[in-house]
Amino acid sequence: MNRHLTGKQKFAFGFGAIGKDAIFNIVSVFLMFYITDIVGLSPAFVGVMLFVARIWDAINDPIMGMIVDNTRNNFGKFKTWLVIGTLINAVVTVLLFTNFDLSQTAMYIYISIIYISWGMTYTMMDIPYWSWLPNLTHDPREREELSVIPRFFASLAAFTVGTFGLFFIHKLGDIFGGGSDSTGIFVFAIICSLIFIFTIGVTVFKVPEDQEMEKLIGIKVKFKDIGRILFKNKELLAIMGVLLTFNLCLQTLNGSIIYYFKYVVNAEHLFAIFNSMILCEMVGLLLLPRFIKWVGRTAAFNTSIICIISGLLIILISGYIAPQSMTLIIIGAGILRIGSGFMVGITTVSLADVIDYGEVKFGQRNESIITSTNTFLTKTSQAVAALIVGLGLSILGYTPNEAQSVVTINGLRIMILVSPLVFICLAAFLYHKAFNLKGDFLTDIEKTLQYKRQREFRERIK
């Protein structure tokens, strides 16, 4: 009873990631910059605010996963919450980048409330989107190919927002606000939100939801079950560690690199060049399925680690020997992004394998609760990275829009490039020492699950 999707359906599912990740990246890349350089609030406040918001997410995200798993209607549990979450999050994103020119105290309160609301509504949409992926196909090879498509479109969104975001903000500010970046980022947020609604709409209306399988394994989940689902599954805990450390590597880099190019090497234009190398991440994602067939998933993972470390070292060294060299930035960022493309694809399909493992070992898939860990860890890494960057900038004596001291410049080098190196090495350690869904063990899980499916199907048609 293997289920297969048409090429158009695979494309439509992945297409939704364009808008979804455009929204994520405008917050990930520009929120710190917006709050510190446009609104004029403390960078330390931003770091602490994001970190505190994640404490709430630790409770909220698994509960949202439970709500999705327990939803039963004719529209489909994934589509229902995907639509609701998208519409609300689009509005909240616009509000997040709306500068009402309030007093400083009022702005601190406003930003805090709206950002926490943004995190909750993003969860409402992101969990059903990624929970849906493991149910779209049960064939392991097709799943590897399918997992790459939304990640490719997500990288396309990250490339567009990261590379051209500042240009759009400045240009829109000139057109609608007389040169005001505050107006520019507000209009940019509106555009991203409209794209978000459109692309998710294509996914919802073009991709069928497999409600028959939901009926087969549709055991109602209670709140008390969440702890067991999350903490009894050792493979889930292992991949959570890999996801957290990998995301911390990227988020620390993404959240601070704009300061590096602007103040350390005095070449702000290199920020756009650096972000344009997300094209290489897209290439890495496209190459990944064939590369895995050639060398295996573990070797592909090792290749990704080597590429990320090599890219970071090239950028670090270039900052000393040729600070404004576009060529070295292109080479370093390009190698790094090929590695991150491999890593994103591998972790996505690995989380889907964990859902299969949970069904074999515990008799329940719990797609949304398990996938909620990915959403939570992504936001957690964003918050921890913002905390590192925000507190780091304050400790180093960073002053916006002014020349920085030697201490600040050297501190920025360490924070921006050495921290990601530490995090990616931790990710490699956890994948090799704690995560076991590889090789023969994964093959055994796939065969056991296929037998289980066939038995359940025969019993159902009797």
Curated annotation (Swiss-Prot):
It comes from the Bacteria. It holds the Pfam family MFS_2. This is Lactose permease. GO terms for cellular component: plasma membrane. GO terms for molecular function: symporter activity. The keyword Transferase does not apply. Responsible for transport of beta-galactosides into the cell, with the concomitant uptake of protons (symport system), and also for transport of homologous and heterologous exchange of beta-galactosides. It is a multi-pass membrane protein. The chain crosses the membrane at residues 26-46, 48-68, 80-100, 105-125, 152-172, 185-205, 238-258, 269-289, 303-323, 326-346, 383-403, 411-431. Belongs to the sodium:galactoside symporter (TC 2.A.2) family. PROSITE patterns: NA_GALACTOSIDE_SYMP. Keywords: Cell membrane, Membrane, Sugar transport, Symport, Transmembrane, Transmembrane helix, Transport. It is found in: Cell membrane. Its main location: membrane. GO terms for biological process: carbohydrate transport; sodium ion transport.
